[in-house]
Swiss-Prot record:
Belongs to the GPI family. One of its GO terms (biological process) is glycolytic process. Keywords: Cytoplasm, Gluconeogenesis, Glycolysis, Isomerase. It catalyses: alpha-D-glucose 6-phosphate = beta-D-fructose 6-phosphate. This is Glucose-6-phosphate isomerase. It comes from Vibrio campbellii (strain ATCC BAA-1116).
Amino acid sequence: MLKNINPTQTQAWKALTAHFESAQDMDLKELFAQDAARFDKYSARFGSDILVDYSKNLINEETLKHLFALANETELKSAIEAMFSGEAINKTEDRAVLHTALRNRSNTPVMVGGEDVMPAVNAVLEKIKSFTERVIGGEWKGYTGKAITDIVNIGIGGSDLGPYMVTEALAPYKNHLNLHFVSNVDGTHIVETLKKVDPETTLFLIASKTFTTQETMTNAHSARDWFLATAGDQAHVAKHFAALSTNAPAVSEFGIDTDNMFEFWDWVGGRYSLWSAIGLSIALAVGYDNFIELLDGAHEMDNHFVSTDLESNIPVILALIGIWYNNFHGAESEAILPYDQYMHRFAAYFQQGNMESNGKYVDREGNAVTYQTGPIIWGEPGTNGQHAFYQLIHQGTKLIPCDFIAPAISHNPASDHHQKLMSNFFAQTEALAFGKSAETVKAEFAKAGKSEEEMASLVPFKVFEGNRPTNSILVKQITPRTLGNLIAMYEHKIFVQGVIWNIFSFDQWGVELGKQLANQILPELADESEINSHDSSTNGLINAFKAFKA
């Protein structure tokens, strides 16, 4: 079980507080000038394909010493062991947390309730293999005998964000099948998607563990109605719909053959479910072998996380540096900035992964915390972000630690595009770290022939303070394996921070209240009668909505 340890009561936290007071004038220019080996000391390699450079952070040896002490005092190692051994560390739902078992390529037994889950995991993988080979190979036929050309994944949250992110990131590996993702209950999403597909050659994947999720089932019923408007016979549904679920009666009632139901388990959290049957759309998009490569990559990072000392453990290092900014520097957000267009949904994926996991104000004993927990996560691909929000990162008043991610080898080496992209990648972290002094600005102005008066009026606006922290994550190439490495790295970073903050990272009760209230409001929207059962604002909005519709 996870221990209940208030991090602020540890000796390490107190030492970090004192260290922060004395280290507020820490300057990256000076840190690099004082230590020619700083990059070597504060960077780590994962295998031969990933380099993590954390040298451009506001840290020194003393900072890291206290951060590792914090990890030890909060018993991080025992927490890691508890998760991987199948203990029910998701206490509020009384569940184990074993997305790692889904990618346990060593097949060593993983016990839940006295039972090894690996045979069941492998059975689902075999079922995915058989199914995807039939669909990709054209053996699976629609109701008119035509092969499938389009896959529509209908899900929401983890049943959508993960598969969508991965299929986009691995687009260079895609086969002939066209992938579409529908998540929003806004009818526009399903209607616009259905305009692009043919009922004779489309396969729908309905991704809902309970087969009751409102948004997913609303879209699923609309898709079935659209399909039957052409196909006519309810029996044809079985050839065009598959389910990623555990509710066999509901799946069967919908018209899906339960042979085409792919199960997963309650120890798989939604935001960690792409490794499970929820990843069926990934396997269909890039092929089963590439899906297994993705699992292999994640398993490699799992092994590193479990077996590596904290001081050399990449997810642990990244997590601790994040805590340094979040809890001591007062940083409220972190930016994830992939310099790879295929990775354009990576930040959005970990926005859910991080904010749904660690957006908690109650500790593991049920008490309100007195310290900051999960940060706001956001980001966009480079170089788009440079022309949008980097201004604030460079010259704004908020400290925003950034992760820059880039591949050394592009899948599209067109002309000199990649060199230009990478020159920006390297330049941005250098600019953020070291800035540009007033003296340098003046010298540039003087060289350009500016007058003293012009210089005096413009210099303050051209100065870059620097000292903006970044991590640089350089990947040889984005492949299924390295993508698996990266996803698992961030997953474990989130876990480490949750352990240290003494919160439960694997529930998400914060999503429930809005859903409950929506279910109460829904019948109130069925007619034109005036509503007065809520507060004045909600009543006014509902009644205005009805008036607009009238």
